């Protein structure tokens, strides 16, 4: 299992496309939404244990990754937090080329675990620093749909970037995915949140035969166990 930042793709396209076929056959490149960072390593481990080739995960915001794919960046599969980004990536896709809703996530308001108690009214407290995702990326669109207009102090390009601001002590509150909080002992939900929609439905596209095999793996009990173990839901929310 290897990770690459999304920006690295820009500089490695030529080298990747020139790599020998035998080398390519020993790995599967998966463009992966940054909100799946914590789970993709375990998914790759299960996949590789079952005999699949090494996974090279290219991590980044869903919109940014989709743009790179449209510009010709080589990949075998694309895991996105925005199913709409799959439109136009494939021409006449077969059913096995697309998986919509292999996992679901929802938003929570997070804060550093050593912070004082908060309540929903604090979202409009101008004395607190509130960080959220920018509109136009999946977490930002979901934030707007759920919470409406908020006095946000800093808009970030991804939920991971919001988490980083919280980790660094640069924000009092941040709107992130429930799985982000579950993965970090230093963060807690600012107040109890019941799972609520609008939810984020993760989707996947296969761009090669190896990618198609990886998508089939996502629909196995082993993959679902990994996803639920990281706090994702694998059935559509009611």
PLM region descriptions:
Residues 1-23:
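Secretory targeting and sorting signals
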Residues 20-50, 63, 67, 82-83, ...:
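Exported/periplasmic ABC-transporter solute-binding proteins
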Residues 54-63:
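A short beta-strand-loop structural module common to alpha/beta enzyme folds
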Residues 97-103:
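A short alpha-helix-loop-beta-strand transition element characteristic
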């Amino acid at each position: 299992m290897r990770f690459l930042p999304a920006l690295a793709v820009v500089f490695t396209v030529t080298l990747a496309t020139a790599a020998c076929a035998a080398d390519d056959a020993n790995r599967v490149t998966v463009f992966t939404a940054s909100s799946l960072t914590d789970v993709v390593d375990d998914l790759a481990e299960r996949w590789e244990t079952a005999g699949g080739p090494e996974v090279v995960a290219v991590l980044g915001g869903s919109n940014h990754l989709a743009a790179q794919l449209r510009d010709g960046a080589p990949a075998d599969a694309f895991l996105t937090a925005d199913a709409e980004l799959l439109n136009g990536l494939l021409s006449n896709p077969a059913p096995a080329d697309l998986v919509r809703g292999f996992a679901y996530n929802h938003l929570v308001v997070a804060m550093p675990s050593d912070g004082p108690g908060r309540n929903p009214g604090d979202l409009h407290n101008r004395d607190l620093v509130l960080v959220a995702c920018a509109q136009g990326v999946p977490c930002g669109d979901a934030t707007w749909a759920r919470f409406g207009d908020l006095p946000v102090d800093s808009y970030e390009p991804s939920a991971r970037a919001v988490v980083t601001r919280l980790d660094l002590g640069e924000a009092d509150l941040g709107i992130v995915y429930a799985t982000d909080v579950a993965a970090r002992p230093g963060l807690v939900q600012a107040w109890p949140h019941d799972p609520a929609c609008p939810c984020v439905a993760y989707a996947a596209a296969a761009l090669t035969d190896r990618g198609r095999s990886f998508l089939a793996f996502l629909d196995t009990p082993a993959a679902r166990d990994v996803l639920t173990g990281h706090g994702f839901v694998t059935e559509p929310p009611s």
